[in-house]
Amino acid sequence: MGCSSSSAVKPVSASVATLLDAGKSKSLGSFQVALIVDPKDARLDEVRDVLARSFAGTTEAAPDSATGWVYDCTVEIGKPLETLSEARVKRFAWLAKYMVQFAMIRNGVFALLDTEGKVVAAAVVVLPGAPTAEVGCEQMSILNKVGMPPPAGDNGAACGGADSRDGKLANAMGRLHKAHAPTSLPHMYIYCLGVAPEAQSKGCGSALLGWIGEAADADGVAVWTETAGAENKAFYSSKEGFTVKGREAVVAKGDAKKGEQDSTLELLGMLRPAPLPVAAPLSS
């Protein structure tokens, strides 16, 4: 039996066209946010690099809590890496390619540029009305473009393997989204948001998240995301008023024969509510 791909569907949020000059960029004070829709745009390489390094972590910056758990099978959240292996670099470079390809189909690649035009942060955002997960043959189509994931080295084989944990995480994200996001209404979905390690703690993430909130308000919709770790929870709640709507324990079973223990990640589903409708003025 054949199947169809959604690769030709590219929804555009009305707010994006309004807020971004010529539908492409907008000044945010010290930064500029850009919507990237051209697959030949040279900045896509910078976006992939920023997302890969942000999620992988470095010896000076902690990895992303959720994808770090997928790779390492540990929940040492907030700690920089002791070493950065070549296998880790390759795995997260592949992950960034996959996420960007997923986003390009949905017109959802946003880059934050500094005053020199360098990408310092990026987000994959599913705009209102677009599918929040791969549909039909889409996953196959993306894999045909980016290739299969390279093996996870380091501790990747523990607790059933990184690919198994990746599937568990994706399923948990889907369950949280279905159970707690406003799925009956159009909403924005932050699939991922990352800041270059060297640009962290400089307002980049706040600026990009703030713009996403501005765009959502212009569309009159809520914003949903999944995340893990106290630091990420605090970032979303303090910057844009996200609240936790659901939690799910994602468990990777350890092999007792190998001396492995189970590893559990607490995944959070967080929501920024839609703006209240503006009341019509009272007539005299």
Can you say where each PLM-predicted feature lies in the sequence?
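Conserved acetyl-CoA-binding loop-helix of GNAT-fold acetyltransferases
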Residues: 192-195, 201-214
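Active-site rim helix/loop that mediates acceptor-substrate recognition in acyltransferases
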Residues: 67-109
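Conserved acyl-donor/pantetheine-binding loop and adjacent beta-alpha core of acyl/acetyltransferases
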Residues: 106, 111-194, 251-263, 276-283
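Conserved beta-strand-loop-alpha-helix junction that forms the acyl-donor binding cleft
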Residues: 191-200, 224-234, 251
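Conserved GNAT acetyl-CoA-binding A-motif
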Residues: 186-189, 215-228
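Short acidic, low-complexity intrinsically disordered linear motifs used
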Residues: 1-12
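Conserved N-terminal entry element of GNAT/NAT acetyltransferase domains
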Residues: 16-49, 53, 57-58, 68, ...
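Conserved active-site alpha-helix within GNAT-family acetyltransferase domains
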Residues: 206, 218-220, 229-252
